């Protein structure tokens, strides 16, 4: 993935096919509703949008069909099949509701969907059901994970981490391992949508969680983050620190981590034992608007699902034109940032969360307030 020219094409195109969803998750980016919203792309408009993805040229980006709940769209399988017929890879992110039947699971497989992502936000019903807003949803989700694995999908668990559930992270890893899930994508909460009512982690807690995720990836688990690009710095530091270790614990030799890290790693090793693989933390150098682009239910294009700055609309112009030429996206890809992010030696590989910068300051190019790292350029001034 590193060889792709992100100025020309993204790796992933997220399409919010609908906002309709039966759940009421407290951290959701969308203000989800139970009926389709007026203005959603029609089948014909959605087909033209899918067709336009070929204008990026090969290799085509992966189309991730999300929502709301993708299964609330009656044409979603036909649209996925159309994308596959064009050679566009497709992933889906269905909600765990009564609509996720065995028939629809088979339907996803029949139209060529290979990767399915499911949200799991707690290691117990007490945590997960409180966040998802539906009693019994935790048990349904664990069953859904196992059903999808048994159906042959590559299954990814999405977890939105916040103060309400951060202590559950080791238990979520255990559930994933027991269910045969090999990919974990951890979303660091942003104050948008209903997420305004949930609690973001502090910079120190974000650092502790990032180091914990690196540890978790050594349990034969591919780990990625969303809106926490500083994880890439942590991965680079940890790999370098391990290589330089003099035999002492490289984490304690190189880093000043807090009690949260200690609790999470102690719990992880208590549940799963020592590492069983080399760390599989996955970083690709993408960020909002760089390798990633988001198309909303009404065709409006945003740098990412958590960055509500409208860039254009696929009803009016091809997505490739918006992605390649919009001034904000050019600035993001050129790492033209302000504050600490602007002088940081990791600004190209990391670059901070543009969504979080905007949510806190109204400026998408400002520094990421969740990062506690002091760039070398600033450290030398002290």
Language model features with spans:
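Conserved alpha-helical substructure of the radical SAM core
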Residues: 1-115
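Radical SAM enzyme [4Fe-4S]-AdoMet core and its adjacent flexible, acidic
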Residues: 36-37, 89, 109-111, 119-121, ...
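Structural motif corresponding to alpha-helix initiation and N-cap regions
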Residues: 43, 73, 99-102, 125, ...
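Residues embedded in well-ordered beta-strands within globular domains across many folds
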Residues: 64, 117, 185, 224-227, ...
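Flexible mid-to-C-terminal extensions adjoining Fe-S/redox cofactors in radical SAM and related proteins
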Residues: 276, 283, 300-301, 305-382
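Short, small/polar residue-rich loop motifs at catalytic or cofactor-binding pockets
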Residues: 286-290
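Short loop/turn motifs at secondary-structure junctions
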Residues: 24, 58-59, 112, 180-183, ...
């Amino acid at each position: 993935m590193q060889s792709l020219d992100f100025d020309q094409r993204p790796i992933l195109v997220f399409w919010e096919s609908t906002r309709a969803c039966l759940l009421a998750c407290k951290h959701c980016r969308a203000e989800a509703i139970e009926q389709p919203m007026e203005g959603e792309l029609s089948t014909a408009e959605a087909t033209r949008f899918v067709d336009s993805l070929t204008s990026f040229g090969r290799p085509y980006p992966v189309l991730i069909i999300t929502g709301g709940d993708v299964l609330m769209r009656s044409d979603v399988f036909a649209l996925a099949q159309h994308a596959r017929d064009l050679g566009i890879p497709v992933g889906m992110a269905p909600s765990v509701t009564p609509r996720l039947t065995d028939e629809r699971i088979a339907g996803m497989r029949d139209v060529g969907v290979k990767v399915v992502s499911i949200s799991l936000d707690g290691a117990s019903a007490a945590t997960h059901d409180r966040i998802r807003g539906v009693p019994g949803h935790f048990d349904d989700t664990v069953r859904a994970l196992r059903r999808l694995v048994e159906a042959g999908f590559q299954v990814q668990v999405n977890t939105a981490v916040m103060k309400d559930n951060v202590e559950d992270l080791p238990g979520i890893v255990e559930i994933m391992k027991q269910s045969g899930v090999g990919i974990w994508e951890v979303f660091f909460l942003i104050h948008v949508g209903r997420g305004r009512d949930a609690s973001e982690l502090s910079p120190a807690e974000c650092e502790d969680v990032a180091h914990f995720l690196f540890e978790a990836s050594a349990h034969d688990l591919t780990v990625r983050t969303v809106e926490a690009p500083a994880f890439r710095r942590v991965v680079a530091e940890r790999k370098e620190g391990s290589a330089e270790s003099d035999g002492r614990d490289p984490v304690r030799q190189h880093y000043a981590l807090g009690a949260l890290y200690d609790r999470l790693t102690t719990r992880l090793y208590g549940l799963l034992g020592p590492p069983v693989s080399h760390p599989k933390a996955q970083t690709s150098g993408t960020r909002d608007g760089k390798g990633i682009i988001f198309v909303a239910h009404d065709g409006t294009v945003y740098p990412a699902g958590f960055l509500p700055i409208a860039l254009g609309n696929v009803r009016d112009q091809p997505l490739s034109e918006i992605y390649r030429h919009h001034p904000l996206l050019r600035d993001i890809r050129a790492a033209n940032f302000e504050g600490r992010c602007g002088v940081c030696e990791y600004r190209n590989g990391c670059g901070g969360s543009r969504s979080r910068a905007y949510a806190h300051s109204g400026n998408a190019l400002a520094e990421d307030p969740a990062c506690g790292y002091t760039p070398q350029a600033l450290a030398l001034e002290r």
